[in-house]
Regions:
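Class I SAM-dependent methyltransferase Rossmann-like catalytic core
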Residues: 22-47
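Class I SAM-dependent methyltransferase SAM/SAH-binding core
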Residues: 63, 69-71, 76-120
Length: 233
């Protein structure tokens, strides 16, 4: 079998460890905007998938699940504001460290952070026009993934869009070489490589998602997992 032929489901990212180095973790959160700008392609997702679903004059709501340091919801809030589109974003993460970092950053109009699980919002009967996540799926085990997708279906009124890394030897090699001179003193490079090892191929993901979800390849090394309620499809 070739390199990365199977998911490294037992590999653990350093920043997910409760006893990880706090200084490296804080530096990792500070460096996320740069690495996500370079590899995650969220501006394209906003332009092609999110913005067409937003009402030009509002109201619009978006839930970002597993928001980490908060750079992705911050970026989406700023893009919508630049386009003159009213958008209220709720960003949630159960990790106390991630939440503390996110709320320590300068405030952005229309964006609020909460330390919470998606299941808690489902229990509260909350709904949002759009539900998103970034680089979250590969962190989850099978039961957690099933729960996330169920929660997403219940929470979204127009669409749920999960953007994640797509496993490939080329992605691994390029990320390894491309990040080698950069991101010192953080978990970016080591955890990024672990993320690629843990991530799904598009075919693997398509085989396990429930009916109603679609998986599409996003170049160069990502895929989008999308759900549209039938009443809004």
């Amino acid at each position: 079998m070739g390199f990365l032929a199977e998911r490294a489901v037992d590999a653990v990212e350093e920043m997910d460890r409760p006893d990880c180095d706090e200084r490296k973790l804080a530096r990792t959160y500070r460096q996320f905007p740069l690495i996500n700008w370079a590899v995650s392609g969220w501006h394209g997702v906003y332009r092609r998938q999110l913005r067409p679903l937003l009402r030009p004059n509002g109201p619009n709501t978006l839930l970002d699940i597993g928001s980490g340091g908060g750079d992705i919801p911050r970026a989406i809030a700023k893009w919508a504001a630049r386009d003159g589109i009213p958008l209220v974003i709720t960003a949630i993460d159960p990790d106390e460290r991630a939440h503390a970092f996110a709320v320590s950053r300068p405030k952005v109009d229309g964006l609020v952070f909460h330390r919470a699980l998606s299941s808690e919002l489902v229990a509260e009967g909350r709904t949002f026009d759009l539900v998103t996540s970034n680089h979250l799926l590969h962190h989850l085990d099978a039961a957690q993934l099933t729960a996330l997708l169920s929660d997403s279906q219940q929470l979204c009124a127009r669409a749920a869009i999960h953007n994640d890394i797509r496993r490939s030897p080329v992605a691994y090699g390029l990320f390894s070489v491309g990040t080698l001179p950069f991101f010192p003193g953080s978990f970016i490079r080591a955890d990024g490589l672990t993320s690629i090892r843990r991530s799904y191929t598009t075919h693997e993901l398509a085989r396990i998602v429930p009916p109603g979800w679609t998986v599409s390849t996003k170049r160069p090394f990502h895929h989008l997992l999308t759900y549209r309620p039938q009443s809004d499809a």
